[in-house]
């Protein structure tokens, strides 16, 4: 995939690395659901769940529904092109400030608008923003980009 600087999110995450953008996870979930239907796996799960060693299969329907939700989680545009949440406070803030991304803001290290990223991305966005600020967008695109990084405790 060509590295496109228009896919660098305001927050420092690279939209091109997102499972919703690449479609890999949604496609795998779709294909698994199709195979499960073909094999009538619901019947197997129902039967095997009656045994103590198969008790986890009691949640088969819930698992199947989660796979369905994963199929729908797609974003082909990236946040700069109309993808992502229309209510993203990070994007709104950067646009109001007239800046290309949070790496141009002196407050990104302590910005509370970023906190909602932590459960899914850890501190990857901060490390990415530091890298973009230090090396520039082109070097960031050619180097190691983080999607998740465990925050130091």
What annotation goes with each model-predicted range?
Residues 1-153:
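Cysteine-centered metal-binding/redox modules
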